[in-house]
């Protein structure tokens, strides 16, 4: 059974409130869970200590048992010092694709052609 530490949504329409839970990865987002290990209230101010509440002991025990946090929960755990989030370094992501490079080359070629005609 693959365990995930993830968010389940609660609250009312336009008033989200999330519980941080340990659940089977195959269970629905708001479905059955094994243990509640924290809460996240995005409606509170960013500097409010009650915005993210974590039960450190429970989280450490579930991480030791092999539970994998989702990206958002891993961000919370990194801020709390419970887990280290690896740095994402993908320099190729900012590079344009092949088609975009071809279009840019054609555009530069077209821009250079009228300039040559005007000079002649």
Curated annotation (Swiss-Prot):
Gene3D superfamilies: 3.30.1320.10
Pfam families, sorted: Ribosomal_S16
SUPFAM superfamilies: Ribosomal protein S16 (SSF54565)
Keywords: Ribonucleoprotein, Ribosomal protein
Chain residue ranges for the region called Disordered: 81-120
Biased composition (Low complexity): 111-120
GO cellular component: cytoplasm; small ribosomal subunit
GO molecular function: structural constituent of ribosome
Chain intervals with Basic and acidic residues compositional bias: 95-110
The keyword Ribosomal protein is assigned to this record: yes
Listed GO biological process terms: translation
Database matches in NCBIfam families: S16 (TIGR00002)
Family: Belongs to the bacterial ribosomal protein bS16 family.
This protein's name: Small ribosomal subunit protein bS16
Classification of source organism: Bacteria, Pseudomonadati, Pseudomonadota, Alphaproteobacteria, Hyphomicrobiales
Name of the gene encoding the protein in the UniProt record: rpsP
């Amino acid at each position: 059974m693959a365990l995930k530490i993830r968010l389940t949504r609660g609250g009312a329409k336009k008033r989200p409130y999330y519980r941080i839970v340990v659940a089977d990865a195959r269970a629905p987002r708001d479905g059955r869970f094994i243990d509640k290990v924290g809460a996240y209230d995005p409606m509170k101010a960013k500097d409010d200590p009650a915005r993210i509440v974590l039960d450190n002991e429970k989280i450490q025990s579930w991480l030791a048992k092999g539970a994998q946090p989702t990206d958002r929960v891993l961000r919370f755990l990194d801020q709390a010092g419970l887990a280290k989030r690896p740095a994402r370094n993908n320099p190729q992501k900012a590079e344009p694709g092949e088609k975009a490079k071809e279009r840019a080359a054609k555009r530069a070629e077209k821009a250079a052609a009228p300039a040559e005609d005007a000079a002649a």
